[in-house]
Curated annotation (Swiss-Prot):
Chain's gene name: clpP
Membership in a protein family: Belongs to the peptidase S14 family.
Any one annotated GO CC term: chloroplast stroma
Functional description taken from the UniProt entry: Cleaves peptides in various proteins in a process that requires ATP hydrolysis. Has a chymotrypsin-like activity. Plays a major role in the degradation of misfolded proteins.
Superkingdom as given in the UniProt entry: Eukaryota
Subunit structure: Component of the chloroplastic Clp protease core complex.
Descriptive protein name: ATP-dependent Clp protease proteolytic subunit
Record organism: Solanum tuberosum (Potato)
Record key words, sorted: Chloroplast, Hydrolase, Plastid, Protease, Serine protease
Length: 198
């Protein structure tokens, strides 16, 4: 079995010859985006670039962002969220598998009434963490202040997107809260749980 991203035949409109493109490239052309790993600066920049390009290409055609992510870096995650709010097309978010930490933040950032979780998906929220354990005291204090600002931002956005009171979200984020698809719907992170269809 070959290793790597599968290739599929694709013909651009007006082009007489089909060419082999990787499956993700083909799906992007249908406005289907994937967040399928931990959020990093590189991944964030790629998704942001795709959202901007597809928005410029057709600002009325909706985008679909499939989320299966354990989370990742906070600032790149916020950058994805902000871009989702900035671009003209509505962005549907669909949780397939796991949307944890910043993954759930991005899931909640989809267009209201267009956020979906598959029936067996899992969603997890918690407060942001810092990796600066070996810093000097002054740096550690500055890092703690910045972390508190980020926590405030995340809590405020979750409260706005879910309709929950700020204090409820603040308390819930103090520990890892795992939810089923129906629990995530009740919490307000998603609007619907997908039903199985054939």
């Amino acid at each position: 079995m070959p290793i790597g991203v599968p290739k599929v035949l694709f013909r651009n409109p007006g082009d007489p010859i089909s060419s082999w493109v990787d499956v993700y490239n083909r799906l992007y052309r249908e406005r289907l985006l994937f967040l399928g790993q931990g959020i990093s600066t590189d991944l964030s920049n790629q998704l942001i670039g795709l959202m901007m390009y597809l928005s410029m290409e057709d600002e009325n055609k909706e985008l679909y962002l499939f989320v299966n992510s354990p989370g990742g870096w906070v600032i790149p995650g916020i950058a994805i969220y902000d871009t989702m709010q900035f671009v003209r097309p509505d962005i549907h978010t669909i949780c397939i598998g796991l949307a944890a930490s910043m993954g759930s933040f991005i899931l909640a950032g989809g267009q209201l009434t267009k956020r979906i979780a598959f029936p067996h998906a899992r969603v997890m929220i918690h407060e942001p963490y810092s990796a600066f354990y070996m810093a000097q005291v002054g740096e550690f204090v500055m890092e703690a202040v910045e972390l508190m600002k980020l926590r405030e931002t995340l809590t405020r956005v979750y409260a706005e997107r879910t309709g929950k009171p700020f204090w409820v979200v603040h308390e819930d984020m103090e520990r890892d809260i795992f939810m089923s698809a129906t629990e995530a719907q009740a919490y307000g992170i998603v609007d619907f749980v997908a039903v199985q269809g054939k």
